[in-house]
């Protein structure tokens, strides 16, 4: 029974990692123009309208 649960957990983690990678696949990379684009900037980046670029998030 514990092997089945362990296999289910491994499968769930694998599925989550695949979905996370596919979300970031169709996004704008660092330095790409982002104004009036249908795509969004990748995770960790924001579109700065004044510079029209995807740049790292400033905290």
Curated annotation (Swiss-Prot):
Recorded protein name is U-limacoditoxin(3)-Dv33
Q: What does this protein do?
A: Probable toxin. Shows a relatively potent antiparasitic activity against the major pathogenic nematode of ruminants (H.contortus, EC(50)=2.6 uM). Does not show insecticidal and antimicrobial activities. Does not induce increase in intracellular calcium in mouse DRG neurons, suggesting that it does not induce pain.
What does its PTM field state? Answer: The natural peptide is not amidated. The recombinant peptide is amidated.
Q: What GO cellular component is one of the record's annotations?
A: extracellular region
Q: Which UniProt keywords apply?
A: Secreted, Signal, Toxin
* Primary residence: secreted
Q: Would you say which domain of life the source belongs to? A: Eukaryota
Entry's family note = Belongs to the limacoditoxin-3 family.
**Signal peptide segment:** 1-19
> Can you name one GO molecular function term for this protein?
toxin activity
Instruction: Summarize tissue expression.
Output: Expressed by the venom secretory cell of the spine. The spine is a cuticular structure containing a single large nucleated venom-secreting cell at its base. It is an independent unit capable of producing, storing and injecting venom. On the back of D.vulnerans caterpillars, spines are grouped together by 50 to 100 to form scoli, of which there are eight in D.vulnerans.
Record localization: Secreted
